[in-house]
Amino acid sequence: MTGKTLYDKLWEMHEVKRRDDGSSLIYIDRHILHEVTSPQAFEGLRLAGRKPWRIDANIATPDHNVPTTKAERQGGLEAIADEVSRIQVQTLDENCDDFGILEFKMNDVRQGIVHVVGPEQGATLPGMTVVCGDSHTSTHGAFGALAHGIGTSEVEHVLATQCLVAKKMKNMQVRVEGKLPFGVTAKDIVLAVIGKIGTAGGNGHALEFAGSAIRDLSLEGRMTICNMSIEAGARVGLVAVDEKTIAYVKDRPFAPKGSDWDKAVTQWQNLVSDADAVFDTVVELKAEDIKPQVSWGTSPEMVLAVDQNVPDPAVETDPVKKDSITRALKYMGLSANQPITDIQLDRVFIGSCTNSRIEDLRAAAEVAKGRKVASTVKQALVVPGSGLVKAQAEAEGLDKIFIEAGFEWREPGCSMCLAMNPDKLGSGEHCASTSNRNFEGRQGAGGRTHLVSPAMAAAAAVTGRFIDVRELIQA
């Protein structure tokens, strides 16, 4: 009998019923809520006279719309200038209070981006099914959990029934073997993967990351990679459970305790793909070939190593690709064959559910220490992923390093990742961003986003352009 993949095992563990149409009813262990995709779901419960099926399976926190300046946060809900944003945050508070759901409210130290808060609280555990009304829920797959985003109607379904109807996906494995070169990070791995397979490469697949380079990553690095599985076309990203996974989860608030912990660890150790498991697709990369990456266009697959030049549509034979490159160059204000290192930056954003954890901030601070933000850079933001990450960074003195260098040290939230709060790009502005999407207008109408690692973003901030971060730091 052929072995099972990690995805196969997780699916079978949670399959309640297989339906005649080929879909299945899947049990959901953890549901994370935020202010944007939950209001209609709660209203649906009220209209139907229902209550959440399992209240303790849900946690909530506002993140997308919250302001990130200290003054705005101290002002409370009334200080949220945008009326829609204010109503959404207030409505989440009211809904969680009404239905008895645990919420880390805007000024709770535990508040933050949903995909940072879940793991740091231990609300995300190996072997779980985890859903949230946000596509980057794939982040939680770093723990050997089956995690994916859902729509607003599905948020209501989970609240009401603790189950979802889903169709099983195919299995894809991305193997990254070898040692990463100095200065190359998890963000560079996943950008290189997307550059290789494209944004449709993982369509219809659960994407498991494996290989020695993945095993060498910390859990925070693995979260970065699983986070951007979505940009590779997959709905699910996974990394097998190992001793690092278990060590990260141990003693966190929601983690099992005592004998329950021992039983859980025994079960979790089986959350790996069997040696003889067969994947529908296998993609391989050599870690030593990966360099610091920079996206140049309007899709995450439009990415290059920092020492390369922007492509020339004139030499592209595929008419669709030719048109895509031409359009991207026009929107981004770049020229064919322009060196990546010639791209000048207006703003820098270090944050988002991709790269706002303590290791990300440490990496950026290492570059910023003793340097100053370039005079040509209008703004450089550092936005921790949660209040607890912020507190840890401040305990380590990272905030002082950033502030002395000329960065703005902010309160936790999604911030400039998306144009749903006051942190936005102006039209035509180039931003080095540690977020996950560089679509047209993603960070503000007419804004031009370049995806990079935290260290590369910090290097861009202090030089005013893209530079190989390895020119600034020592091994």
From Swiss-Prot:
PROSITE patterns: ACONITASE_1, ACONITASE_2. SUPFAM superfamilies: Aconitase iron-sulfur domain. It catalyses: (2R,3S)-3-isopropylmalate = (2S)-2-isopropylmalate. InterPro entries: 3-IsopropMal_deHydase_lsu, Acnase/IPM_dHydase_lsu_aba_1/3, Acoase/IPM_deHydtase_lsu_aba, Aconitase_4Fe-4S_BS, Aconitase_4Fe-4S_dom, IPM_dehydratase_rel_enz, IPMI_cat. Disulfide bonds: none annotated. Pathway: Amino-acid biosynthesis; L-leucine biosynthesis; L-leucine from 3-methyl-2-oxobutanoate: step 2/4. Its cofactor is [4Fe-4S] cluster. Its EC number is 4.2.1.33. Gene3D superfamilies: Aconitase, domain 3 (3.30.499.10). Binds 1 [4Fe-4S] cluster per subunit. [4Fe-4S] cluster binds at residues 353, 414, 417. The keyword Iron applies. GO terms for biological process: L-leucine biosynthetic process. Keywords: 4Fe-4S, Amino-acid biosynthesis, Branched-chain amino acid biosynthesis, Iron, Iron-sulfur, Leucine biosynthesis, Lyase, Metal-binding. The keyword 4Fe-4S applies. Pfam families: Aconitase. PANTHER family: 3-ISOPROPYLMALATE DEHYDRATASE (PTHR43822:SF9), HOMOACONITASE, MITOCHONDRIAL-RELATED (PTHR43822). Catalyzes the isomerization between 2-isopropylmalate and 3-isopropylmalate, via the formation of 2-isopropylmaleate. Heterodimer of LeuC and LeuD. This is 3-isopropylmalate dehydratase large subunit. The gene is leuC.
